Every structure is written in structure tokens, then in C-alpha cells.
Amino acid sequence: MVESLLSGIVLGMIPITLAGLFVTAYLQYRRGDQLKI
């Protein structure tokens, strides 16, 4: 039962981590675009 709980936590963290990386990359892209202008 502990293994299923850990697997659930991992599966829940993966989308959050991917979303965080995507948002960070998007903000850095916007910031670089603003610096060019």
C-alpha cells in the first residue's frame, strides 16, 4: 500500500514539474524578447 502511495505521489509530481519547467522557459523567452526590443 505504501508503494501505491509513492507511485501516486510521483505520478502527481511529474505534470507539476513539467508545467513549472514550461512556465519558467516561457518567462525567460518573454524576458529575452523584451530585452531585444
From Swiss-Prot:
Residue spans crossing the bilayer: 5-25
Subcellular localization(s) per the UniProt record: Plastid, Chloroplast thylakoid membrane
Example of a GO biological process term: cytochrome complex assembly
Molecular functions per Gene Ontology: electron transporter, transferring electrons within cytochrome b6/f complex of photosystem II activity
Any one annotated GO CC term: cytochrome b6f complex
Function (record text): Component of the cytochrome b6-f complex, which mediates electron transfer between photosystem II (PSII) and photosystem I (PSI), cyclic electron flow around PSI, and state transitions. PetG is required for either the stability or assembly of the cytochrome b6-f complex.
Protein name listed in UniProt: Cytochrome b6-f complex subunit 5
Gene this protein is translated from: petG
